[in-house]
Curated annotation (Swiss-Prot):
Organism name: Enterobacteria phage RB70 (Bacteriophage RB70)
Protein encoded by which gene: ndd
Keyword annotations of the record: DNA-binding, Host-virus interaction, Inhibition of host DNA replication by virus, Modulation of host cell cycle by virus
Position of the signal peptide: none
GO molecular function: DNA binding
Purpose of the protein: Disorganizes the host nucleoid and inhibits replication, but without host DNA cleavage or degradation. Only the architecture of the nucleoid is affected. May act on the host chromosomal sequences that determine the structure of the nucleoid. Binds to dsDNA but not to ssDNA.
GO biological process: symbiont-mediated perturbation of host cell cycle progression; symbiont-mediated suppression of host DNA replication
Source domain of life: Viruses
UniProt name for this protein: Nucleoid disruption protein
Pfam families linked to this entry: Phage_T4_Ndd
Length: 147
């Protein structure tokens, strides 16, 4: 199994939304509309080279907190991963990828362009972000996450 890289994210169509350090925005805060989008957020540290350090997903929320809630959990050090990110004094570039663009990283992972075109999309009403998250864990390793 290989580590997910920035190249994998770029090939899937991910966009950089900013940089965090210690659970706070570093060098400017993105607009709330960007942070409240449902989908996947990936953290990449220069220290880890082009490998993705961690991943988080955000669903639809009435409060529209989105990735801001993830940052709050990091600042509060609510898990081992959050404590590591909060305490290691490293800057992380944050990439955003909507669920609609996850096919190359989940069901289409490792397939050529032709096979990818015929691979199913995630459109089932029962498809969950949790299921996509597990597919990512099946296909890739992440520097700071074991699963």
């Amino acid at each position: 199994m290989k580590y997910m890289t920035v190249t994998d994210l770029n090939n899937a169509g991910a966009t950089v939304i900013g940089t965090i350090k210690g659970g706070e925005w570093f060098l400017g805060t993105p607009h709330k509309d960007i942070l409240s989008k449902p989908g996947f957020y990936f953290l990449v540290s220069e220290f880890d080279g082009s490998c993705v350090s961690a991943r988080f997903y955000v669903g639809n929320q009435r409060s529209k907190q989105g990735f801001s809630a993830v940052l709050s959990h990091i600042r509060q050090r609510r898990s081992q991963l959050a404590r590591t990110i909060a305490n290691n004094n490293m800057a992380y570039t944050v990439f955003y990828l909507p669920a609609s663009k996850m096919k190359p990283l989940t069901t289409g992972f490792g397939k050529g362009q032709l096979a990818l075109a015929f691979t199913r999309n995630h459109h089932s009403e029962y498809q969950t972000l949790e299921e996509m998250n597990r597919m990512l864990a099946d296909n890739f390793k992440f520097v700071l996450q074991a699963y």
